[in-house]
Amino acid sequence: MLVCIPEVLPKSEVAEFRRLMDAADWEDGRSTAGAQSAMVKRNEQLPPDSDLARTLGRRIVSALTGNPKFVSAAVPLQIFPPLFNRYAASGGHHFGIHVDNAVRGDHLTGLRIRTDLSVTLFLAEPDEYDGGELVIEDTYGSHEVKLAAGDAVLYPSTSLHMVTPVTRGARVASFFWLQSMIRDAQARSMIYDLDNAIQALVERLGRDDPETVKLTGIYHNLIRYWAEV
């Protein structure tokens, strides 16, 4: 399940992020990659332990956990502290095909998560750079994603994916992972579809409609059945 989430951050906040990030020191992105990923990764990152990365990351997590579409699709249990990367044409930056590590640990907080879902939050407008598409492969083929600044995409961490070479400008983004309360991807997808159907019925029939109430009960009971907390 691939879900695009518009306007996670407003344009004004994206501009503030970019101003702070443009003034920061960046490091080789391979410092946070696993052995296989490091062989195909060419980009820059904000130092993950820097005050700036941690501060901006907390703001992203706060925005996402208040976003109903994100909560519905992810059913998040733990969110890894967001990281920040930059792909510049001047550096020939790209990230070859790879799959994310199954478990991520943060040595500052001691947090360890199973990576169920990956998130990319775009911080550069599509017309600021050429190339840099996020290409995600699943059973239905390849999907190219290049969203407006402030928008995010959520996709299974089990997916093979890549970032195509940037040939003009710079692609700036935040990326991170989360552990869902619902481990099984198919169950999580059904929960998301059910929630969307319930919200559509609420709009049409009202929250007090007996069938809407019944379906809402089924939704919560399915989460109760599947959730790991």
From Swiss-Prot:
Note on cofactor: Binds 1 Fe(2+) ion per subunit.
Gene3D superfamilies given in the database record: q2cbj1_9rhob like domain, Rabenosyn, Rab binding domain
Pfam name, any one: PKHD_C
GO process terms (BP): DNA damage response; intracellular iron ion homeostasis
Cofactor: Fe(2+); L-ascorbate
Highest taxon listed in the record's lineage: Bacteria
EC number: 1.14.11.-
EC class of the enzyme, as a word: oxidoreductase
Binding site for Fe cation: 98, 100, 161
Residues annotated as domain Fe2OG dioxygenase: 78-180
Amino acids binding 2-oxoglutarate: 171
Keywords of the record: Dioxygenase, Iron, Metal-binding, Oxidoreductase, Vitamin C
GO terms for MF: 2-oxoglutarate-dependent dioxygenase activity; iron ion binding; L-ascorbic acid binding
Record-given protein name: PKHD-type hydroxylase Rpal_3968
Biological classification of the source: Bacteria, Pseudomonadati, Pseudomonadota, Alphaproteobacteria, Hyphomicrobiales
